Amino acid sequence: METTEDVAVHLSERLSVTVAEITVRSLARSLEHWEKSPTKVATVMFKVHPSCVQEKPAGDQWYIPAMGNNRTCRRLILDTHFRGLTPLNDSSHLQTSYDCIAISGLASHPFGSWQPKGDDKEFMWILDKLAHGEQSVRAILFGYDTKLKDSTSFQGIRDLAKHLIDQLQANRGPKCETPLAFLAHSLGGLVVKQALVDLAKNRFDIGYQILRDAIRGAIFFGVPSQGMEVSAWKAIVQGQPNEIMINALSSTSDFIPKLTKAFNETLPEHCRFFWAYETEVTPTAITEPDGQVARKGEAVKLVSEDSATCGFIKSDPGVTIPINKSHSDMVKFCEGSQYYAIVRASLWQVLQPTLLQPDDTDYDAQYLLSRHVESNNRKAFEFITTQHDWWAKSRTP
């Protein structure tokens, strides 16, 4: 399948949905490079639920059998969870290519977290601006499960970081040197920082070294380098196994200071980072009478400017980005957002610092962080349903 039109026709035949009710938003080669017959991954929006979903509406992944006796036709996988790595495009072979990994935050959806709130789900900036607009950048979503209510998971940030490393190593290939950068929101940024620390500590592992050398840096959005306000979340997860995760995010936790210190000490010299911070309060999460979790509680500042910028708002504001949105909304850029151009320019400074900065200026990330440390020593596919549309991811032969 070579075009989005091909995918729409194929899905129509396999799912008994008319082509007019299917919108294929992206098509990319699967990251599973070891396959003899490579598959492709598409992000798709349906105007009506396919019958397989209607039969099992509580699911988040469905298998559609192959058609007849055609051996070239594989079983189709449809999912709305987007867990693991999901490529949104293929980078151009005509120029130097880069990978950009987008990682959402706590209790988030890998795709929906980057979309504006509301019924209109036509726009998602990482797909529609980054993936479709930058031919040399391959945009990839990293999804993981950190739901709050009724969770049975006791995974921690170290576990998530190890899973991120495992996914990147497995899907990029053992000798892949394609430069990569991260767009990371909230908890996602702590996962990236822990992964970088772990890559540095295992310096004798060749695979870890190759991956570490490929990483160019990140743009962090509201990442709590000094902890964050978690009292509302604590009330929701009290007594659950995932309580350990929420406690680790607290401003009184000893985990984050240790992670920040280790990150500062092991940071690769070739990396560069930008730090975005929210400037609006955020409604806290509450449990409603029907048992659903909703952001309808008291509005508070979840992550302070100092915490979100690792202190650079005072020591080097040039690497900080103020975003006049709440903690949740700060990555939900609408179409035409004033912030995309800023993030795009910052991303290219991460990916191509030598092309964008004067040769005689030291923009070394280690230098920036060491200044902050010295200063401190002198005084730290959602199941997206709307009235009209439904998003999903499809793997096609």
Predicted region positions:
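Conserved alpha/beta-hydrolase
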Residues: A131-K147
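Short alpha-helical elements within RNA-binding folds
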Residues: T3-T23
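Serine-dependent carboxylesterase/thioesterase catalytic core
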Residues: S104, R158-P268
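C-terminal catalytic-base region of ester-bond hydrolases, centering on the histidine
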Residues: P38, C176, W233, T266-P397
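RNA-recognition motif
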Residues: V19-P38
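Conserved RNP beta-strands of RNA recognition motif
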Residues: L11, E35-E55
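Short coil/turn segments at secondary-structure boundaries
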Residues: V7-H10, E55-D60, G112-G118, S151-G156, ...
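Short, surface-exposed "cap/lid" segments of acyl-processing enzymes
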Residues: R83-S136, L199
